[in-house]
Structures are given as C-alpha cells and as structure tokens.
Curated annotation (Swiss-Prot):
Function recorded in the entry: Acts as a component of the essential kinetochore-associated Ndc80 complex, which is required for chromosome segregation and spindle checkpoint activity during meiosis and mitosis. Required for kinetochore integrity and the organization of stable microtubule binding sites in the outer plate of the kinetochore. Participates in SAC signaling that responds specifically to disruptions in spindle microtubule dynamics. The NDC80 complex synergistically enhances the affinity of the SKA1 complex for microtubules and may allow the NDC80 complex to track depolymerizing microtubules.
Subcellular location(s) of the protein: Nucleus; Chromosome, Centromere, Kinetochore
Name of the protein described by the UniProt record: Kinetochore protein Spc25
Disulfide pairings: none
Amino acid sequence: MSNQFNTRKRLMAMLANEMRLEQEENAIAKQSAKFHSKFATTMENIKRQQHESKKLNTLLNQRRDEVEKRNALKNAVRDKLAEEEQHCAEMQAQLGKKKQERDKLIACAHILSEAANTYINRKALPERVKGVAVSPDNGQWIPFDFNAHDRQGLAALWTQVNRSSRNINKWRQLSSVGNSSMPAPSGKENANVSMTSVIEIDLTSPPSQK
C-alpha cells in the first residue's frame, strides 16, 4: 500500500510538473507572439519612415534645385539690371550731348534766320534742305532745294542771299560755329556736314521782310 501511495504521489508530481511546463510554454508562446507582433509593427514603421525619408530627400533635392535656379535667375537679373543701368547712364550722357548739340544748332538757326530771313521746310528734312530765303537787296523770295549733305548748295545759297549784305559777319559767325564741332552722320563725309548741319532745323514761322 505504501508503494501505491508513492506511485500516486510521483504521478501527481509529474502531472503538476507537466501542467507547470505547459503553462510556461503558453506564457512563452504569448510572449513570443507579442514580440513578433511588435517586431512586425516596428518593421512596418521602419519601412514607412524609410519611404517618407526617401520622399523628403526627393523633395529636398527638388527644393535645392529650385533654390539654385532662383539664385541663377537672381544673378542674371542683377547682371541685366546693372547692364541696363549702364546703358541708361550712357544714354543719359548721349542725350546730354545731343541736347548741347541741339542747343548749338538752334542758336545757329536763329543766326541764320536773322541773317538771311530763311524758312526751312521741316517735312523735307533730314534727306533734303528745302525752303525759301529772302534777298536783303530787293526782298526777292529765293527758293532752294538741295541734298542735306550738299555743301556746294549751301555755299551757293550763301552767295546769292548775301550780296552786299549788312549781316556778312553773322554769316561768318554761322559758318565758324558750323565748322567747329558739328557731328558727322553715318556714311557721309565730314566735309559735307559742317555747313549743312547748321540749317537742318525747322523754323516754325515764315520769314519777315526787312
């Protein structure tokens, strides 16, 4: 009977150990499942973060390219602006020079008008010098029409309207101013400019009789 009791006791101990092992296995299985679940979630998060990081890198590269293009455009605009400012400064200088030349031409035109009572048709300029002058001797109207660069034409007009003229000194002054610093037009000789340039101005009123 003692042997039966011992056998039963051993069986109970074995059953208890088996149940304990089974519980431990279940606990380990639960922990393993939980670990694998967390691991899978972590891997998914890592993949998602890697994908987002890739997108951010792509966007960053795009933004970097845009910044480089904007900087290049800004530099180009700045260079163009500097070029335009330089061009404007040169144009201002040219305009100032042209204004001085125009003022000198206007002064010459006043001398011409006073010296010879000359009217110039502005519609014929700048190709031709066309108009009418009044002879100081008899008040005769003398029409003229010649090429704007024809020095001989102006010389002939000078001779015709200044016979016995009391304003000969003004004509000489006009010629002197004309020969000093008149600008030469492109493609024309300087010799054909000095005398003709001074009368290429429209006089807005007809000549007066003296």
